[in-house]
Structures are given as C-alpha cells and as structure tokens.
C-alpha cells in the first residue's frame, strides 16, 4: 500500500529534501521515507549527502542512524551529541594471557577473498607444517565458490608458482559464517569439526559505513559462530581484528591502546565497523576468560600494498587512506593538522607473514598489534609525490573539497569536521619484542614504495 507522503515542516527539512531530490532524481519524496529502504541510497549517495550537509557537521554515520529527513533534521536541530552505542561498552572485560601452541596441520580460513586473507592463504601454502587449508567462501554475484577463489588467486598471485600447492592443500567450502553451522549442512559441519586444528578468522565486513545490523551479523554474530565451531572442534582460534577498536579520543587525552587493553574510555562516533570489531573482541575475550577456547587476537593497522611487488587490493577506491590522499592530490592543498599526522604503513605480505610466524612461536600474549612502528608523517608522504601542496586552514580546506563534488572525499571532510577527536594512539611494544625474539622486524618505508603508492592513487 502507498505510504502517505509527509511534506517538510521546516526550512531545514526542505533543504535536506531538495538535496535528496537532486541526488536521487526522485520527485516525490516524503520526509518519512527511509533513505535506504524507500529511496535506495547507496554508500556514494550517503557520502554525497554528508558532504553537502557538512556545514551542519553531519557525518556519514549520522545518516545511517537518522535515516529519514525528519530524524536527520531533528538530529541537526538538537545538535544531539549522544552517541548511539557508547552505553554498550562494557568495562569489565579483561585480557588474560595464557600461552598455548597452535597445531597448524589443518586450518579453516575465512575471508580468503579479502586482501589480507588471500595473503594469509599464501603464507599457509608455503608453510610445510600446514597440510590442508579449508577455505570457507560464500557464493556471491552469480559466482560460484570456485570462481571467487580463482579470481582472487589470479588477481593477487598471477606470477607466483603456487598451482601445485593449491591443488595439494586447498579444500573449498561453500558456506557463510553469518549463519548457523557456518552455512554448511549439519553433516558437513560435523565432519569438518573432526578435521580442523586451527581456525584463522579473517573474514569481516570492513566497509567504513553502513547499517549497524548488517555489520553486527558480519562481525559479531559471525565471530560467535566461529567461537561455537572452535568449542565443537576443540580447534584453536586466531582472530583478525583492527587497531581501530581503540576508537577515538580527545586530542588532549593521554590515552594509549596497548596489547593488554581493550577499554581506554574510547568513543566510537557511531562508527559501526569499529563498534562491531570491538564487540567481536569482547566475545572472544569472554570465552578465553571462561576457559572455553584458546585464542589469540591480531589487531591490524593500516594495511598497504605488498612490499614484494607493490600489489594492492582490487577494490582500491574502498580504501579510506588512499581516498584521503586522492582528495589532497585533487585540491593540492593541505593543513598543518594533516601534515602532522603520523601514519603506519604496514605492507600486507608482511602482516600475513608476521601473523603466521607469531602463531608458530607460541608467545605469552593474547593480543598482538600488527602494525609498522616506523611511522611516517603525512608531510613526508605528500612531499614524496613531487606535487606542490599549498598550506591553508581547515575551513578553507573543507570548502575546496566540497567544490570538487566527489562523494569519495567524504572521508577527509569527516576527519576535518572534528579536529578535537583523533584515533586513539596505540603502542606495539609487546608485539615488537615477540617479533624480535624470532628475528623479524618491520622495514622503514622507502621512496620507491611511496612512488608506487602514488601511482596506485592516480588509478582511483
């Protein structure tokens, strides 16, 4: 049945309505229409809407929560600073360190079609301890599981000699970790649970923006299902997480996320990726505390192109860091705030290698920070591009970006809108010690590496 069309009541509602008309081309919009279900907005539309409302300090996540004109206008009018999820944060989770040894002979790997997951696959293929690798993949876009697997191998490993190793070690499973029994039949699930010795859970929804329940299923429910499998199979778990579980803190706070902390009174600005990855860690830490599973958590930093051959993720435009650099290259301006940011550049092949090596080393710690500690300033990165960047202030920078009218620039606008908040600083000291003990270290980033990064950005 037709929903009644509600007309705008205020100037602000009218303004949002007109922007939506121009974005969607839909003439007849009700102020109660849901942006996603009724108007069919996609993530680029959302970025565009947030950019066009940036004078109201509206961020992308706000649009996902207040997802019709009435709610969004109200959010702007009340300057409602309440963050939807902050009350969910539990303060009673502790990280317990219990050393144990992984048996790597039979590994279940999720997320193999992702950039990190595919590089973890490579490390498992060349590791003689690993006899079988079961890859859990779901059918997608009319592509079979085999199609998706082959596409990844061809994209990332076309000039690697691994066909024989794949034929010998890899078993593809048509499943879905968001579902009960990992989307397998009960019989398949039961048979699998008798074989697997280690689970590497690299699968996740890593997009930056979207609806909470979609992320909850992919990042939290999935992790609960993986934990269930580990309990059923007595397999040990390696869980791939992110440094950004540290969320944001005030620029003047002296907060530090270490490998022995998960709560640092961070705020998440309604960032659903961060929130759900945080919640997933809490689920695992709870089960470790209750002695139900043996698990380690690997928090990854800024995953960047391989150091060996410069390859980067297929869906480059979805990478927030590259999008930000592209925006700066488009306007050829920067600010002191941007210049002074220090960035970790962690080549994906080293991330994958270090994860597997740390698993084999049976270290004391439960949580590791897989992030290159040789930080590099944005100023240094921009200088390496051989482009002249003029200096300006934040306000002018936002205006310049908005003139470009490209929704991908929303990442940088979001950063500039709340200069008082920074991503919570973290340290890698404990992980560094463990890496040093097995004779591994992160390299300093070279000019050539940055040159390759520049060439990649120019392809976006």
Regions found by a protein language model. Give the residues of each.
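Amphipathic terminal alpha-helices
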Residues: 106, 127-134, 426-460
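NAD(P)-dependent short-chain dehydrogenase/reductase
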Residues: 251-258, 286-343, 348-353, 357, ...
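Conserved Rossmann-fold NAD(P)-dependent oxidoreductase catalytic core, especially the SDR/UDP-sugar
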Residues: 193-194, 198-202, 209-217, 221-272, ...
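Active-site Tyr-X1-5-Lys
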Residues: 265-299
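N-terminal Rossmann/SDR dinucleotide-binding element
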Residues: 80-198, 202-205, 212
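Mid/C-terminal beta-alpha module of Rossmann-like enzyme folds, strongest
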Residues: 354, 358-415
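Phosphopantetheine-dependent thiolation modules in NRPS/PKS and related acyl-activating systems
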Residues: 1-97
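A hydrophobic C-terminal alpha-helical subdomain
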Residues: 334-338, 397-438
